[in-house]
Regions:
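N-terminal amphipathic/basic leader segments beginning at the initiator methionine
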Residues: 1-15
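Glycine-rich phosphate/diphosphate-binding loops that line cofactor/substrate pockets in enzymes
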Residues: 19-34, 61
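Small-residue-rich
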Residues: 31, 60-61, 70-73, 88, ...
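Short glycine-rich or small-residue beta-strand-to-loop segments that form or flank ligand, phosphate
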Residues: 32-44, 66-72
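An N-terminal, globular interaction/scaffold subdomain
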Residues: 38, 54-56, 63-67, 82
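Histidine-anchored nucleotide/phosphate-binding helix
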Residues: 43-62
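A generic structural motif
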Residues: 61-73, 93-101
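An acidic, phosphate/nucleotide-engaging active-site surface
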Residues: 77-123
């Protein structure tokens, strides 16, 4: 049986990551982008590195890019944490979402509609 996995010894290089992210932008003209990476509690996921590279690729193409860390129930990302995780991105680019106070219900998606658009994959 052929192995369907590969053990990485060195991880993905910045060049490989940039190449993959560039490929995702091919044929697209993006004006406004919101990136929602995990917060500092997931630092080791490398999401900050991915976000930073994506941010610079997008802004070089003229896109307005905002970043809103997905806090879940955690505290907002501090400036010190931001500078470690999201290297090269100004702290002011972060949109802080106050999950305790600023979540407003604007409607409800009926289950029947979800079933229809997902061809019964979601119930």
């Amino acid at each position: 049986m052929e192995d369907i996995y590969k053990i990485a010894v060195s991880g993905i290089s910045d060049a490989e990551l940039k190449e993959a992210l560039l490929k995702s932008l091919e044929g697209r003209t993006l004006k406004k982008v919101l990136i929602i990476p995990p917060d500092f509690t997931r630092f080791h996921s490398q999401a900050g590195r991915i976000t930073s590279i994506y941010y610079h690729l997008l802004t070089e193409r003229g896109a307005q890019v905002d970043i809103m860390p997905a806090l879940g129930t955690h505290e907002p990302v501090s400036k010190a944490q931001w500078e470690i995780m999201f290297k090269g991105i100004a702290y002011e680019k972060m949109l802080v979402h106050d999950w305790r106070h600023d979540v407003v219900k604007i409607g409800e998606v009926p289950a029947s509609y979800l079933e229809e658009i997902t061809e019964n994959l979601w119930h």
